[in-house]
From Swiss-Prot:
Post-translational modification remark: Synthesized as a 75-kDa precursor form in the endoplasmic reticulum (ER), and then processed by proteolytic cleavage through various intermediates to yield a 55-kDa mature form, with the release of an 18 kDa polypeptide. The conversion to 3-oxoalanine (also known as C-formylglycine, FGly), of a serine or cysteine residue in prokaryotes and of a cysteine residue in eukaryotes, is critical for catalytic activity.
Quaternary data: Monomer. The 58-kDa mature form is composed of two chains resulting from proteolitic processing, the 42-kDa chain and the 14-kDa chain that remain stably associated and form the 58-kDa intermediate form which is enzymatically active.
Protein name: Iduronate 2-sulfatase
Needed co-factor(s): Ca(2+)
Chain residues that bind Ca(2+): D47, D48, C86, D336, H337
Active site as annotated: C86, H140
EC number: 3.1.6.13
Molecular function in Gene Ontology: calcium ion binding; iduronate-2-sulfatase activity; sulfuric ester hydrolase activity
Cofactor: binding details: Binds 1 Ca(2+) ion per subunit.
Localization per Swiss-Prot or TrEMBL: Lysosome
Cellular component terms (Gene Ontology): lysosomal lumen; lysosome
Amino acid sequence: MSPPPPPPIWRQLSFSLLLGSFCIALESAAQGNSATDALNILLIIVDDLRPSLGCYGDKLVRSPNIDQLASHSVLFQNAFAQQAVCAPSRVSFLTGRRPDTTRLYDFNSYWRVHSGNFSTIPQYFKENGYVTMSVGKVFHPGISSNHSDDYPYSWSFPPYHPSSEKYENTKTCKGQDGKLHANLLCPVDVADVPEGTLPDKQSTEEAIRLLEKMKTSASPFFLAVGYHKPHIPFRYPKEFQKLYPLENITLAPDPHVPDSLPPVAYNPWMDIREREDVQALNISVPYGPIPEDFQRKIRQSYFASVSYLDTQVGHVLSALDDLRLAHNTIIAFTSDHGWALGEHGEWAKYSNFDVATRVPLMLYVPGRTAPLPAAGQKLFPYRDPFDPASDWMDAGRHTEDLVELVSLFPTLAGLAGLPVPPRCPIPSFHVELCREGQNLQKHLQLHDLEEEPDLFGNPRELIAYSQYPRPADFPQWNSDKPSLNDIKVMGYSIRTVDYRYTVWVGFDPSEFLANFSDIHAGELYFVDSDPLQDHNVYNDSQHGGLLHSLRP
């Protein structure tokens, strides 16, 4: 028996937006290269990284190596994940399908079994002659990737996981009492932790080893490197804390729960509450708040984790340069979703707000996004975040256009010279190779307008979609990560250059169906007048015309 069709939300909402001149239809095809001039791919995926980076205008965070990459890339200022939680987001952008197609909203199913035998980005490159390799956290481990990181479909070799991963959530954090705890805040002396190393350090070492191996390979490579930090716990070398004195750390600009926020939209950050140092604060559920001094410490450790991550990225990029691979390797850098640092009185991800769904995204294409270096010069020399001289960086190319992570699949294929997978039909459960995202090559302006006019469109017509499930209309213990069978409400969200519109509707998990006549709550925020999304005007009568045009 064929599976039931997916919820019609995106088809219906897109149709409504088309009538209002908000929707764009883009198709593209790419000419294939011969094997001799094929470009390699380095895909760097970070866990829980919001765009708190120097290259995104953050004046506090020290990220000189990522900033350097951005200076040679096209940087997307407005890139959004399709669901702000690890496994669903990664499966979505690695297959090029939205969560309503993968049917993964939690961590407990494998898309090839429960939805469709969908091809992945690395699988497509593997089938086109690439050696595909995975280091660290690329797919989310466990059931959602078949306890194998989708090997052997996606990878030429079994994926590498650092041996020290198993200590991430154990009692390795030294408290003020001198004992070891499983804390949220966990700056460590690396020499004192089990194995004397950390997972991201091991991933960097393995990535460099593989690059050295591929230097002499006759085949092009696709290397995906997944970093853990700044995912909690904030377990990082303690010296990075010195970059962020507490007296320089401010609270979020909007640290309180907005009065107009529907309860269903709030995430009660239960994973943070489980940590021993947070438990000791005896914070009320669901809204808190966390004491202000501890809020500053959380933000300090998040930023310190980002700078630690930056050094690891810097070592990999420097090695790529030293091996003379930077001239023929496309680099894509992104995150699976963002992370709230106290905005709206929320922490972690698990929502449809920009702070949870907006991600960094940059694409480096050798000789096209930036000139190739002269002989003897390096594109990516390692930059020390502790060196003030590392702060200065040339500005790269930026685009303000709204884009989605689900567009990575067609974009990387096109940039590498492979045929761009066709757009998915509706439904597409029976189609192994297709994509629901756009080809972002148009934003890189690497094409001749006369040859491929359909690659270009009005930036104001672009839209980013995201969604998040809830088990109830009010925050409860499993609101952040409900299992499929517990989902009762789905929040579907549209982000345009002008507004974010979210509608929370009834959802039947047994049929994977949303009921758009059963509206539980709504949100409407105007970007220009309310960039932090604190003033929900969904119930204001003056916006009734806009809401009527948006409702399916």
